[in-house]
Amino acid sequence: MKAKRGETITIVGFGGSITEGAKATSSDKQYGEIVAQWFRDTFDVNVNYVNSGIGSTTSLVGIHRIEEHVFAHNPDLVLVDFTTNDSAGDERYRSPYETVLRRILEDTDTAIISVVFGAVSNYSADNVANSNYRANNSLSAHLPSMLYYDVPVIDYYGSLWRYINAGVIKWTDVAGDYIHPSNTGHLMAASAINCYLSDVLANLDDIDTTVPTLPEDYFFGDDIYETATFLGGDDIVPVSNSNFTVGKVHGIKLKKGWVCTNNTGGSITFEIKAVTSLTLYLQYKEGNSVGGIYVNGKTVISNANCNNSSTGGYIWLTDQVRFDEPTDVTVTFKCNGVFGIGPIGVTYAK
């Protein structure tokens, strides 16, 4: 164990806005930073904590940014948080989440802890009657992968509701809104993780240190996302372009995308070689215009709406643009006004 030997360790928080620190009043109040501080206090070592949380992103986005936001930092421990943002009941998230776990475990020097958060329905800051109901998260879709790879799971959300249902606390005691923990909630989540780590440390002499062999097959049988990556404005050059320029869209932590600032709209076309799927197109708040996505001359999406009231979103294309063999694709994006698009998610043959 590197920390016990006095070596510097690196921890990556990988997830959505909770990991990013929403509703925590300072970085040292975020659950990931508190876990990092536990290592500093326990082992008196240097700890690098890398916050790779991005608000409103899912494991589908995560698997496309894993190289840049996880592996580039050579982590010793990754705290994985996507169980809130992956839509409850949407089975499409099973495969990207499994691939996140599997890709990290393939780096045999890296450990994982899956952290489970959640939200409430009918939120009320004043706890009025018939408010703050427990909402579903995607634990039921993620749990088979967690168990299959024997990943430690800290179910903060499930444990929290046992206290709420017993009348010990209210949702608003530990949350800053309908979904994000307050400083108190971040501390509780970190304390649960640190309790697990303390138990591991206390029983370290009895733990088999042999790195387990990954199962040969994926649990859900779909390895399409194993090669997932983002292609951004610095990676590919359009073959035709009208009114789009390369640029960061609202400062989000992803690669540069392309922005159209012309009120009459524009179009941009890319040729991408030998892909097995065009996984998604990211879009971000730049205006109220509508865009269309066309792949190999066929309309895939005709009404991509970049809503000015949101920070952005993404369009899932795997179901519509997926190939049995590596295929060259021509991708065109058209819009009728100001619009911003993020990097293009693709997968390649292994």
Predicted regions and their residues:
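Serine-esterase "nucleophile elbow" of acetyl-processing enzymes
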Residues: M1-G55, R65-N74, A274-L282, G287-G292, ...
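Alpha-helical scaffolding within the catalytic cores
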Residues: M1, G32-E33, S59-A72, R92-R103, ...
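Extracytoplasmic/secreted cell-surface and envelope-processing proteins
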Residues: A22-K23, S59-L60, D86-Y97, N122-N127, ...
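Active-site segments of SGNH/GDSL-like serine hydrolases
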Residues: D81, N85, L101-L139
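Cell-envelope and extracellular/periplasmic
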Residues: S17, N51-G62, H73, L77-A88, ...
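Conserved catalytic region of serine esterases and O-acyltransferases that act on ester linkages
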Residues: L187-K350
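Structural recognition of the beta-strand scaffold that forms the well-ordered cores
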Residues: T10-F14, T19, N48-G53, L77-F82, ...
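Catalytic His-Asp segment of secreted/periplasmic serine-dependent ester chemistry enzymes
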Residues: Y123-I224
